[in-house]
């Protein structure tokens, strides 16, 4: 039974879809005025993992993730660089798609853009005006009247009285209440604008997501996700707009991932303390970054440090090393995940993996389970049990595939991951490091030369060095294979 932590109710709840066997899910995507940083990557990886697991569990999923391609920040950046908004956003949308492909993130089923959804946005603004939830200010902007919506603050646990008393709100005489938020901004000189019944202008940020999600998924859908920073005011305002416009419940389950933190602060562009995905991938394989993100529960803060990334690199190296020399066979995972129909329902590894993931997508436990499968695989190989080793390798790749991991051939990963430093054989801090991947390969190559020259003493000496480092060698017709542990 899958249980999801619902930010709206602040507790884990059994997941019951609106329509049996089907899931409709919307996630707030990027505002495309710069490259993706690790905080954006966390949102994409987390909800990609959710989609993969839901599909693996047999659900038919419609996954929508929007692109915000008109916004104050976009306008400012385009003006700063002296280029059109379209040129700026097109470049960063392409970069976004390239980054998500690098991280093995499945593309969403639908990816609406704000600038292509004006009809739906205008229709919702019109509804809110007609129903008395919105008004036009003297400056031509249209605002949402928060005092008109009885449930405002339920998602974030805030009350209007407390917000008015405790929040610093910029004075705007066009508003009836300082907490009212803009739905439609009247056109300003030099800014892009669209025609509307209230004059030319452009949408506010919050109305974009309400209109796009309802346009793609209907007025009531299963899951809405995004970063923790969006819970208030963005998602709070989405609920207010959407439920006022439709008269019914908007979303059943709200999911929010925690911040990525750098030097004890939230990683963000506004603070200037961020690493782009591309900067990280200059030093680490994409699957290492993905493993790093999944190594913390999605609701917990994720501390970005080199040590944590190196630990993830070591873990991925051990997983791939265990798979070296084993033919891929028929994995039970596909690009869409695996179906439990194709697994042995009594397999204890599968049962425990599912138990972890059913507990609000507990990826740290799921990754620990992958490493238990790795240990079992290494033991089978050491015992010469080829059949069991093959079966465990297929299982390891299949379960890893649900997390978006182990998609490469082992030799390709080990080559591409650029293992240039000593890789610790354990995540525990302070333990002695062992030979690097390149160092092991060099010793194996030296031993191969010694064996060709029938210098058995030298070959045995090198085997002994490797054995002391926990490296097991396996001489085959195709060459010498090695693995840790």
From Swiss-Prot:
Gene name of the encoded protein: cysS
Motif ('KMSKS' region): 266-270
SMART domains from the UniProt entry: DALR_2
Pfam families given in the database record: CysS_C, DALR_2, tRNA-synt_1e
HAMAP family: Cys_tRNA_synth (MF_00041)
Short sequence motif named 'HIGH' region, residue ranges: 30-40
Protein name: Cysteine--tRNA ligase
Superkingdom of origin organism: Bacteria
Species annotation: Nitrosococcus oceani (strain ATCC 19707 / BCRC 17464 / JCM 30415 / NCIMB 11848 / C-107)
Assigned EC number: 6.1.1.16
Keyword vocabulary terms for this entry: Aminoacyl-tRNA synthetase, ATP-binding, Cytoplasm, Ligase, Metal-binding, Nucleotide-binding, Protein biosynthesis, Zinc
Lineage start: Bacteria, Pseudomonadati, Pseudomonadota, Gammaproteobacteria, Chromatiales
Protein family: Belongs to the class-I aminoacyl-tRNA synthetase family.
């Amino acid at each position: 039974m899958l249980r999801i932590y619902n930010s709206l109710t602040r507790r884990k709840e059994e997941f019951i879809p609106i329509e049996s066997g089907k899931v409709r899910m919307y996630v707030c995507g990027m505002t495309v005025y710069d490259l993706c940083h690790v905080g954006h990557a966390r949102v994409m990886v987390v909800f990609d993992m959710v989609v993969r697991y839901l599909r693996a569990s047999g659900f038919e999923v419609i996954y929508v993730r929007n692109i915000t391609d008109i916004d104050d920040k976009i306008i400012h950046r385009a003006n700063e660089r002296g280029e059109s908004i379209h040129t700026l956003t097109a470049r960063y949308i392409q970069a976004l798609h390239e980054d998500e492909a690098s991280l093995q993130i499945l593309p969403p089923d639908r990816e609406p853009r704000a600038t292509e959804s004006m009809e739906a946005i205008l229709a919702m603004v019109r509804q809110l005006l007609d129903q008395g939830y919105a008004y036009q200010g003297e400056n031509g902007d249209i605002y949402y009247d928060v005092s008109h919506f009885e449930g405002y603050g339920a998602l974030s646990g805030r009350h209007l009285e407390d917000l008015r008393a405790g929040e610093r709100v910029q004075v705007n005489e066009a508003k009836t209440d300082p907490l009212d938020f803009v739905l439609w901004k009247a056109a300003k000189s030099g800014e892009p604008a669209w025609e509307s019944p209230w004059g030319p202008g452009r949408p506010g940020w919050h109305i974009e997501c309400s209109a796009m999600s309802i346009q793609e998924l209907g007025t009531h859908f299963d899951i809405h996700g995004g970063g923790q920073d969006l819970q208030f005011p963005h998602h709070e305002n989405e609920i207010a707009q959407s439920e006022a416009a439709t008269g019914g419940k908007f979303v059943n389950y709200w999911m929010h991932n925690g911040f990525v933190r750098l030097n004890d602060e939230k990683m963000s562009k506004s603070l200037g303390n961020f690493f782009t995905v591309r900067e990280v991938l200059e030093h680490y394989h994409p699957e290492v970054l993905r493993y790093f993100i999944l190594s913390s529960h999605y609701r917990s803060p994720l501390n970005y440090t080199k040590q944590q990334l190196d630990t993830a690199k070591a873990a991925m190296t051990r997983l791939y090393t265990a798979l070296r020399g084993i033919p891929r066979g028929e994995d039970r995972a596909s690009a869409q995940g695996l179906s439990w129909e194709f697994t042995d329902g009594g397999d204890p590894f599968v049962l425990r993996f599912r138990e972890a993931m059913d507990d609000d997508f507990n990826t740290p436990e799921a990754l620990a389970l992958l490493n238990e499968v790795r240990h079992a695989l290494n033991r089978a190989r050491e015992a010469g049990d080829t059949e069991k080793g093959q079966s465990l390798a297929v299982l390891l790749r299949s379960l890893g595939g649900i997390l978006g991991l182990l998609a490469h051939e082992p030799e390709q990963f080990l080559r591409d991951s650029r293992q240039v430093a000593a890789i610790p054989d354990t995540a525990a801090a302070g333990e002695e490091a062992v030979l690097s991947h390149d160092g092991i390969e060099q010793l194996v190559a030296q031993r191969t030369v010694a064996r060709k020259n029938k210098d058995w003493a030298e070959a045995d000496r090198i085997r002994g060095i490797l054995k002391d480092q926990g490296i097991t060698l396996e001489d085959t017709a195709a060459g010498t294979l090695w693995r840790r542990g």
